[in-house]
Regions:
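Positively charged n-region of N-terminal signal peptides that target proteins for export
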Residues: 1-4, 8
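Repetitive helical segments and hydrophobic/amphipathic motifs
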Residues: 11-12
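Soluble, non-membrane globular domain cores that form compact, hydrophobic packing
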Residues: 21-118, 124-196
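C-terminal motif of bacterial Sec signal peptides marking the signal peptidase cleavage site
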Residues: 16-19
Length: 196
């Protein structure tokens, strides 16, 4: 009886390990590599944030939420509704008068305090507007009156026709920018300024 039980347990263990190994191998072969992402470029603002967020280890991740009220996600980035210019300005610091220059947006925020980490990614309709629009985002964020602590740093970058604006605690911003740069070889930094 003990032999049968031992053989049964051993068989279950072997099948479990084989199944896990096969699943891991499938994930690696069907996943999108960083080279593919860089070669093809991002397809949406949300894709940029999801690609970066997947690079975070469990230790690097923080309590997060993303998206506008209609598209809110917990512990993940989300799409931001461009129809709500007030929320885009209030939550992400994007100047509401400039919303017409966008056709896509996504966000990732620290769930407990947005001054700790706030990131907005915006697809600009006309690439000629990118640098001027990035400067307006910077000015709009720096002109804010802060409550519940000051963010330490603001960084604005581009990935193709996308503007990535991120502000908050210096350590979290540095981690994010490193992972963004690792994900997309076309990242170009436009601004890196202290806030507090």
């Amino acid at each position: 009886m003990k032999k049968i039980l031992t053989l049964t347990i051993a068989a279950v263990l072997v099948f479990s390990l084989v199944s896990c190994a096969k699943k891991d191998k499938e994930d690696v072969t069907t996943g999108t590599s960083a080279a593919d992402v860089q070669k093809n470029g991002p397809k949406s603002a949300l894709e940029i944030l999801e690609t970066v967020w997947k690079k975070y280890s469990a230790d690097d991740k923080f309590a997060a939420m993303g998206g506008s009220e209609k598209n809110m996600k917990e512990d993940a980035p989300g799409e931001f509704d461009l129809g709500d210019a007030e929320a885009l300005d209030f939550e992400l610091g994007f100047p509401k008068a400039e919303v017409g220059k966008l056709d896509d947006a996504a966000s990732l925020l620290h769930m407990l305090n947005q001054n700790t980490f706030t990131c907005g990614v915006y697809h600009v309709k006309n690439s000629a507007d990118i640098e001027a629009l990035a400067a307006k985002i910077k000015d709009n964020i720096l002109a804010r009156n802060w409550m519940c602590g000051f963010p330490e740093k603001l960084v604005i970058m581009t990935v193709g026709d996308y503007i990535v604006s991120v502000f908050g605690a210096a350590e979290l911003i540095s981690t994010f920018t490193a992972k963004l740069t690792d994900s997309y070889g076309s990242v170009r930094q436009l601004f890196d300024v202290p806030i507090a």
